[in-house]
């Protein structure tokens, strides 16, 4: 195993180094990309499917830029029968809220045959990704990596000799359109567990790279190496230090990642540096990204497994695998030991232990000491007219046919003006089944005063089934937030004293554990309309999300292409003819 000296090797410079805030404006570039989004035939796991690809490939192309650069993506919709948008996950879109890529929220969907220019600045180095944000297009395969390196003249607060990127996802053989119909049916037809876990879009169905160790038994995968589903092998040299960037764009699953025989040192989370800590395995929820460092200090005559396993749900999907190939060994030389054993799927104490080890690196921005407003969001599973839905404070989100950003900016009455509730009834028991028969659909907006501090308490509860409460990773668009803490049961005022105001991590995605709460804090300093939602694709489709608006009057001229639908489109036409 990696020695403790490895951890100290990184720990000392990470503690001593101050974060640089300088940006080399003169060296910033505009990086242009021309993308066509279309359905293509592909074999992500050995079974040919129709996937949503970009420029004929799956996953989509990796974008690499430097902090301070401008990214310009000319995206053409070649889907023929449906609209499309792309969300740049983790990019705050400061000054460009219309480029956030959320249909009906920040922009109108891009119609078939149309081209939309996403132009935005990547202001902060980190590990990010992008994905579809219209219907369930992420489940259809519309995603890729977005890596932002430090700006010219800057250095990372750690050393490494090389880097790799792993984009994690899950894959169903049932198409995303059929999944949408199933989730909208009465009674509900649940989509079930994915057939395969993918690493960089590659997995193996009905066979295993580690067949001799698999339980239940699976045949050995017979690969030549050129198949679309053949694993992307990580080739390394002995006694080197590598950075592994990892992000999860799963539609459903929470995952555990491990490298056989190697410890990992976590140094980045969601584009923010953290105090380094060593782990044997790590949880990664949908919407999260990390960087870990590992040292190739094991027996150089062997290769090692890299594995991902399902967490938080009963694992009915085989683990995903690839190889850490110590050169000059052949990549066909399989490890002699079985893949790393994952923690039990419902060992939430293990998961909480990992989350509670994440602290901001010294020199990171600190949260304001007090809030101006607290919003407590209770997530429950409900029945509305017989349909199974998720609701927040008894309201299940249904996006309007009109555009939030344009409607608010130009004073168009396009959605429910009644604000959603800031809390839920005090007598609600989060530990018991509750039908919540008074739940409703809604599209109201939380109007947040500009440049104020907001606390969000995510409160989990029992679902419709007895003694069932699920993990939910929540993602905020347009912002990073401070994770102030986690707790068990129902949040109360006395829990405030448990908040970590000294070194809470900055994140854009945070998990809420079963029957527990998570406390977040952010500052409303980015004018726009921003989604805040569970990053599990079926849960968002079933209503688990809210909408925040802040400082919309400060938003500068919105590109007409982002407004060209519904009432904002009519406004454009009216102005054209007047």
UniProtKB/Swiss-Prot annotation:
Cu cation 2 binds at residues 89, 131, 535. Its EC number is 1.10.3.3. Binds 4 Cu cations per monomer. It is an enzyme of class 1 (oxidoreductase). Glycans are attached at residues 206, 349, 394, 438, 451. This is L-ascorbate oxidase. It comes from Nicotiana tabacum. Cu cation 3 binds at residues 133, 477, 533. One of its GO terms (molecular function) is L-ascorbate oxidase activity. PROSITE patterns: MULTICOPPER_OXIDASE1, MULTICOPPER_OXIDASE2. Keywords: Copper, Disulfide bond, Glycoprotein, Metal-binding, Oxidoreductase, Repeat, Secreted, Signal. PANTHER family: FI03373P-RELATED (PTHR11709:SF394), MULTI-COPPER OXIDASE (PTHR11709). The keyword Cell inner membrane does not apply. Highly expressed in young and growing tissues. Cu cation 4 binds at residues 472, 534, 539, 544. It catalyses: 4 L-ascorbate + O2 = 4 monodehydro-L-ascorbate radical + 2 H2O. InterPro entries: Cu-oxidase-like_N (IPR011707), Cu-oxidase_2nd (IPR001117), Cu-oxidase_C (IPR011706), Cu-oxidase_fam (IPR045087), Cu_oxidase_CS (IPR033138), Cu_oxidase_Cu_BS (IPR002355), Cupredoxin (IPR008972), CuRO_1_AAO (IPR034259). Its cofactor is Cu cation. May be involved in a redox system involving ascorbic acid. Cu cation 1 binds at residues 87, 475. It is found in: Secreted. Belongs to the multicopper oxidase family.
């Amino acid at each position: 195993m990696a020695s403790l000296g490895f951890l100290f090797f990184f720990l000392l410079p990470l503690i001593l180094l101050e974060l640089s805030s300088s940006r080399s404006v003169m060296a910033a570039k505009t990086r242009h990309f021309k993308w066509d989004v279309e359905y293509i035939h592909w074999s992500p796991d050995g079974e040919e499917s129709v996937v949503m690809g970009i420029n004929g490939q799956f996953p989509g192309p990796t974008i690499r830029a430097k902090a301070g650069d401008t990214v310009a993506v000319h995206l053409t919709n070649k889907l023929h029968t449906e609209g499309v948008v792309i969300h740049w996950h983790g990019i705050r879109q400061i000054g460009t809220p219309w480029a956030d890529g959320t249909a009906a929220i920040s922009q109108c969907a891009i119609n078939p045959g149309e081209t939309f220019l996403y132009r935005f600045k990547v202001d902060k180095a980190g590990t990010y990704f992008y994905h579809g944000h219209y219907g369930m297009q992420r489940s259809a395969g519309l995603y890729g990596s977005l890596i932002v390196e430090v700006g010219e003249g800057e250095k990372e607060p750690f050393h490494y000799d090389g880097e790799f990127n792993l984009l994690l996802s899950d894959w169903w053989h049932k198409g995303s359109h059929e999944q949408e119909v199933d989730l909208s049916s009465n009674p509900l037809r649940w989509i079930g567990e994915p057939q395969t876990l993918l690493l960089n879009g590659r997995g193996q169905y009905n066979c295993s790279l580690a067949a001799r160790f698999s339980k239940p038994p699976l045949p050995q995968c017979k690969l030549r190496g050129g198949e679309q589903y053949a694993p992307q092998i990580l080739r390394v040299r002995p006694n080197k230090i590598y950075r592994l960037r990892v992000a999860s764009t799963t539609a459903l699953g929470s995952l555990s990642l491990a490298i056989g025989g190697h410890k990992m040192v976590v140094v980045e989370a969601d584009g923010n540096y953290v105090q380094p800590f060593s782990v044997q395995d790590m949880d990664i929820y949908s919407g999260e990204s990390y960087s870990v460092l590992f040292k190739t200090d094991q027996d150089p005559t062997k290769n090692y497994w890299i594995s991902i396993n399902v967490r938080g749900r009963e694992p009915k999907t085989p683990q995903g695998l690839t190889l850490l190939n110590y050169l000059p060994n052949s990549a066909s030389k399989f490890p002699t030991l079985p893949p790393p054993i994952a923690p039990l799927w419902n060992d939430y104490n293990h998961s909480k232990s990992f989350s509670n080890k994440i602290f901001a690196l010294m020199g990171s921005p600190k949260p304001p000491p007090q809030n101006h407003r607290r919003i407590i969001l209770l997530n429950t599973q409900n029945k509305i007219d017989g349909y199974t839905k998720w609701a927040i404070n008894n309201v299940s989100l249904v996006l309007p046919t009109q555009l939030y950003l344009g409607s608010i900016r130009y004073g168009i009455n396009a959605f429910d003006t009644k604000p959603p509730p800031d809390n839920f009834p005090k007598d609600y028991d989060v530990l018991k089944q509750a039908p919540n028969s008074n739940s409703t659909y809604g599209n109201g907006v939380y109007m947040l005063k500009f440049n104020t501090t907001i606390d969000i308490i995510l409160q989990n509860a029992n679902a419709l089934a007895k003694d069932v409460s699920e993990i939910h990773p929540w993602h905020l668009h347009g912002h990073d937030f401070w994770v102030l803490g986690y707790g068990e049961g129902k949040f109360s005022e006395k829990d405030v004293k448990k908040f970590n105001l000294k070194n809470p991590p900055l994140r854009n995605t945070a998990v809420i554990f079963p029957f527990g709460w998570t406390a977040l804090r952010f500052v409303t300093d980015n004018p726009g309309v921003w989604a805040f939602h569970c990053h599990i694709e079926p849960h968002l489709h079933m209503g688990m999300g809210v909408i925040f608006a802040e400082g919309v009057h400060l938003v500068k001229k919105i590109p007409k292409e982002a407004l060209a639908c519904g009432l904002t489109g009519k406004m454009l036409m009216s102005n054209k003819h007047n």
